[in-house]
Regions:
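Acidic, low-complexity interaction regions
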Residues: 262, 271-367
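A positively charged, amphipathic N-terminal helix/segment that binds anionic biomolecules
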Residues: 1-159, 163-250, 254-278, 282-289, ...
Length: 367
């Protein structure tokens, strides 16, 4: 969070959070009005003009608007699918795009601490909310599957991590298999081995009800977790405004780096050969994330990584990657350190990228 605050200060903007008092949208579509924390109706023409310019979707609920027009975070709300959405100040969005290394690098810095906090919560005695959220996060770290929302399950019959049901899980000893229909009807079939995690997931399955990830309240009632609870937990364990998507982006970029290292054994030299390698790599990442190649390239793989590969600026990093499956946490951490070294090199301008190509890739990424 410290780095984020520093970046906000450098941008000339001010910090804001929806946990702070703000302006709240009331009423129904076509007849909205706005109130302060104290319930006073907002009548100031300048404030109302700013709110109108934000173009907040009518379908959003629980809308919070920052009091100050200089706030880096301008609006939050819940969309029709039940997902929390954020609208940032244009200057902040622009700065984050220009600081190409910023979000992934900062995420990599807090990841070790987040893992330690998850491990601590996994050792809790009771299957309370915190322990089940930690179990859910551990499954995410293993699989990188989407979080999912109750709205998507009801509307489209698709599932994600937080909406999985017991019928989607099969456990045999230390082997855990997740088989379900994901977003856009894509069939997901993920298997991994982890004796401890399999035991923890099995304990969740023993809680009455169809939902896989449920917890016991202090009153011994069982309730399911949801995407909001999980993303709030992520913000807590990272001390920053990260979400489940950041874990998937980190995992997708790390997998891309690993696959580039594996494919580079063949030492492709021509531009055409390198482009073929990139297609192959993106297919591998897509398989891991349960996405299409196009979505992975635009949203889950850091574009500068692919450009560095094409420009022969990734070789020294690929040589340090374990090209055998990273079955141990030590091997995984080694590869993550290599990725961090690359991101720091980008930050320090030691990796030179063609500006036109970089901007095009980043425009796609933020779309």
């Amino acid at each position: 969070m410290v780095q984020t605050l520093d970046e906000i200060k450098l941008s000339g903007l001010t910090y804001a959070s929806d946990s702070q008092p703000g302006i709240y949208r009331k009423g129904k579509p076509g007849n909205f009005h706005y109130e302060t924390k104290d319930g006073e109706r907002v009548k100031d023409k300048e404030k109302l003009a700013r709110i109108k310019a934000l173009v907040i979707p009518p379908a959003w609920t629980e809308v919070w608007i920052a009091n100050r027009k200089s706030a880096y975070l301008q609006v939050t709300g819940i969309d029709a699918a039940g997902r929390k959405q954020y609208r940032y100040h244009p200057d902040w969005t622009s700065r984050r795009s220009e600081s190409k290394y910023f979000r992934l690098l900062e995420f990599g810095k807090v990841l070790p601490t987040a893992r330690k906090r998850i491990a601590k919560d996994l050792r809790r005695d009771d299957l309370d909310e915190r322990k089940v959220l930690a179990i859910c996060m551990q499954v995410m770290l293993k699989t990188l599957i989407r979080v999912g929302t109750g709205a998507y399950r009801e509307l489209y019959g698709s599932h994600g991590l937080t909406t999985l049901r017991n019928k989607h899980v099969k456990i045999e000893g230390s082997k855990l298999r997740l088989k379900f229909i994901g977003k856009k009807g894509v069939k997901q079939d993920v298997t991994f081995n982890d004796k401890t995690l399999a035991k923890l997931v099995k304990s969740c399955m023993e809680i009455p009800g169809q939902d896989l990830f449920q917890y016991y309240t202090e009153g011994n009632e069982h309730r399911p977790i949801d995407s909001g609870k999980l993303n709030n937990y992520i913000k807590e364990i990272t001390d920053c405004d990260f979400s489940a998507k950041d874990f998937r982006t980190w995992g997708g970029t790390l997998e891309a780096l690993r696959q580039l290292a594996i494919c580079n054994v063949e030492a492709p030299e021509t531009a055409t050969a390198k482009k073929k390698v990139i297609v192959k790599v993106l297919d591998c990442v897509a398989s891991k994330l349960g996405n299409t190649r196009a979505v992975c390239k635009s949203s889950y793989v850091y574009p500068v990584l692919l450009e560095a590969f094409e420009n022969d600026q990734l070789n020294k990093y690929m040589k340090k990657i374990n090209i055998k499956p990273a079955v141990s946490i030590t091997a995984l951490e080694n590869d993550e350190k290599v990725l961090m070294a690359f991101l720091k090199a980008v930050k320090n301008n030691k990796i030179t990228i063609k500006k036109a190509a970089s901007k095009k890739a980043l425009a796609k990424k933020s779309a």
